[in-house]
Amino acid sequence: MKKILFLLVIVFGVNKTWAQGCSDAGICSINHGFQTAEKQFKNTIEVAAVYSLGEADVQYFSPYVSYTKRFNDRYSFTSKVTLSTAHGSFGTRTQLGDAFLIGNYSFKEKKNSQWSALLGFKFPFTASNLKINGYSLPLDYQSSLGTIDLFLGTNFHYRRWDFNAALQIPVINLNKNSYFKEYSGTDDFPSTNLFERKPDALWRASYSIKTPNKKITFKPNLLFIYHLGEDTYENIFSQRESIKGSDGLTVNGNWITTYYFNKQNSIELSAAVPFVVRDIRPDGLTRSFVLGILYQYSF
């Protein structure tokens, strides 16, 4: 119990600040692609809802549904669809976000350790140019970044530890955002006209703590996300311009608690806060706090 309390203090004992949250970019949440349900079940459905706080008091409600098919002990496939509602001073916007298709391969387990590899894609439902009453919106109000992305990842599991690394690479840019802060009357959000985003790299460490009856699992996570370059946009003179300070490191802490009703049904609560942030986050993924709930059913 002392170990659990100590980890809680580490994860949540921070001042309010801003960080890249686990939202549209997707790289924070693909670790579910490394996880598998009980091996006797071939199918898993997840239904989740996420509430988060963004920049300039923007609030988000982001439900999603996913389906995982296990073909055998080695191969599994996951599909996922997201929805996003953003509410703030610009108004309220609700729209489908992205579809994820992720394949996972698990290598043979050896001496309480196992490697797995992941390959996936993200497809947007919008070109990131949703408007309210005809007015262009910053990326903080968009449900997707409007890019087709490639995910490459690997995970090493040893006893109660998991270590995973991943890359998220935008391969096709469909972003048609037309927001200029010069015409918006506020400096809360940077200009992101025809936004082009650089890749992200992630490294995550997590540790699982199970109660004696194995009904509850606590899993603290530490995430290091490095944005590999400065994002760009097209300014009012039709010239491409780098967004200074948009590259660099983000460090997030995440605490997950899972309760198992039985082998087929479980519910998961998660909360995340930032420790280290980038100077500027034009992609609209700024979050001061993220709270999620997930129900999982396997059959």
Model feature map: region roles:
Residues 93-195:
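Outer-membrane pore/translocation modules
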Residues 59-63, 94-99, 113, 144-150, ...:
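Residues that define the transmembrane beta-barrel architecture of outer-membrane proteins
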Residues 58-63, 89-94, 128-136, 168, ...:
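Outer-membrane beta-barrel translocator domains and adjoining extracellular loop/strand segments
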Residues 74-77, 110-115, 160-165, 213-218, ...:
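Repeated loop/turn-to-beta-strand initiation elements of outer-membrane beta-barrel proteins
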Residues 66-68, 104-106, 153-157, 164-166, ...:
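Transmembrane beta-barrel domains of outer membrane proteins
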Residues 49-55, 69, 81-87, 107, ...:
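Transmembrane beta-strands of outer-membrane beta-barrel pores
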